Amino acid sequence: MIKKPRGTTDVFPEEVVYWQRIESCARKTAAKYGFGEIRLPTLEMTELFQRGVGDTTDVVQKEMYTFQDRDGKSLTLRPEGTAGTVRAIIENGRCSDALPLKLYYILNCFRHEKPQAGRYREFWQFGVEMFGAAGAPADATVISLANSLLRTLGVKDITLHINSIGCPKCRPAYHAALKEYFSAKKDILCPTCQGRLETNPLRILDCKNPECKELAESAPKTIDFLCPECEAHFASLKRCLDAEGIEYGIDPMIVRGLDYYTKTVFEFIAPVVGAQSTVCGGGRYDGLMKELGGPEMPGIGFGMGINRLILAMQGSGVTLEPDDRPALYIASMGEKANETAMGIVEALREEGIHAETDLCARSLKAQMKYADKLGAAYTLILGDSELASGTAKLKNMSDSTQTDVSLSDIAALRSLVTE
């Protein structure tokens, strides 16, 4: 038996209903905030993520699915959506669009991680990106959008954690403080973080190794090294969130796992998910557009994991069932009755009615059992006598009442099965 690759999922109708609810609510919420949808290629040039996400990140060093195509070009299955969105804006000449430019996407991403509950190698994200607005009100707007969606979906006990990781002006002093702190404890660091100590000490704060995490808790905090501009930006963000009535906590451990972030970073935590409790994460990336060859243009956005959102909804007691019960099932006996039944159900389908009939040459008893299993609201038995009279009995499956109907009056039949 051929099995699916590790870390991927098969999603059947009873769970797809959660995906559909999330996607529908995400689109409606994004539209309320003025965001339009963008669709991006699954494959990108590897250089995009090396330059955009950062060479020293776990994503680039350990997690990307990268290969050479037949032309010898290095391609990568996208591990996230922000870099591709920026690339699309630059490549298609959209930097001169009216600002702020607001875009959202729903897409699958790929990372070679250890699969566990809420963490997959192919995972889906709803993400938003806003370009051209440098102030904290833009940050608060993006956070508000995420907050609104999570509450619309019924996720309980959500908490918002915010931090500022500074900008290129103030980050060197912070990097120096981190390097000094971790150098004294280098022997305790994992081999990967010992290398990060020289290349990018900020990434040590994002390490999942227990010893490194414990050391990171006592490390210097970013908010103690902010320049006046970043301090003012963070203070403005807090005032905006207060004005919007959005509760938050300051978490100096949030640095996010991608190098393009500047100033504001944030996460929404849903404890009902379990160990992988971050259901949304994002921040500001004011230098990414220029880094990838475009003009200087500030950006702010987030990614929300759909797989984890489903766990959060289910853990919060949100129960959804597929709305796929047929309004009518026609049980037919004989070739002529089968053909007539096919014509009736197709006419009803043209009217937007979910109707079914037998396709497997079942006995009448087996057909009625199948109709009950489908949860059909009404059934109609069609045989030689019904064909001869041109009428049949329509049975309401909930109360067993029966009504005579004309086989030629599709409008009347439609009216009865949609009452």
Q: What residue spans do the PLM features occupy?
A:
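TRNA-recognition modules of translation machinery and tRNA-sensing kinases, especially anticodon-binding
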Residues: M1-K365, Y370-A412, L416-E419
